Amino acid sequence: DLSVITVNYNGFHDTCEFIDSWAATVFSVSYEMIVIDSGSTANEAALLQKTYPFIQAVRSERNLGFAGGNNLGINLAKGKYLFLLNNDVCMVKDAIPLLIKRLLSSDKIAGVSPLIRDYAEPHAIQFAGYTQLSPITLRNRAIGKGKINKDHYPAQKTPYLHGAAMLLKKTIIDKLSLMPEEYFLYYEELDWCTYINREGYELWYDPA
């Protein structure tokens, strides 16, 4: 049901830590894991495939960027749900059923991002939803960033998902579009989320 997609660029050890944390934490759903090795200096796809036979490691000889790497993974994905995760993320609990429950709570919901905590300070929040972009500064902020996690940030709609962790309905992405690749790195998920919103769909943050 679930296609987990992550992009690796000269990040073998981070990617291994991510895969190890996922395999040790997530048991609630069947999944495929697609790792896109996007132009790493060495062929890290081959190393990852040898280390983790259960994944599908795909090598791109050139660096496709954040959007291009994820789009390659989306095109290969067979699951009903896409979970795009940065390769420096570490899973700490199996919240997948709760995130899928949120995703399925309305036909209008296209995607959901979970609570994200700081790697160096696990009690500190990195993301609990986003504010809108300011029309004056064209900047926004992550709700709760730097605060101690005390369950003060309930589920709510968010204008943008967090690029480090985005769970999406594949049917909607197939209907709309892949992630825009013009940016190469940064802002592509904001543009993508803005487009998804304009097409009448909702995006949610869920603490799961």
Report the location of each language-model feature:
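A conserved acidic beta->alpha catalytic loop
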Residues: 12, 21, 37-46, 62
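Short, acidic, metal-binding catalytic loop of nucleotide-sugar glycosyltransferases
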Residues: 20-30
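Short beta-strand/loop segment that forms part of the nucleotide-sugar
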Residues: 30-39, 58-60
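Acidic donor-binding/catalytic loop of UDP-sugar-dependent glycosyltransferases
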Residues: 43, 89-102
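Glycine-rich, basic loop-to-helix element that forms the pyrophosphate-binding segment
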Residues: 59-77, 87
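Short aromatic/hydrophobic "clamp" motif used to bind/position activated sugar donors
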Residues: 82
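Acidic/His-rich active-site region of diverse nucleotide-sugar glycosyltransferases
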Residues: 98-177, 182, 190
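Catalytic donor-sugar/metal-binding loop of nucleotide-sugar-dependent glycosyltransferases
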Residues: 172-185, 190-208
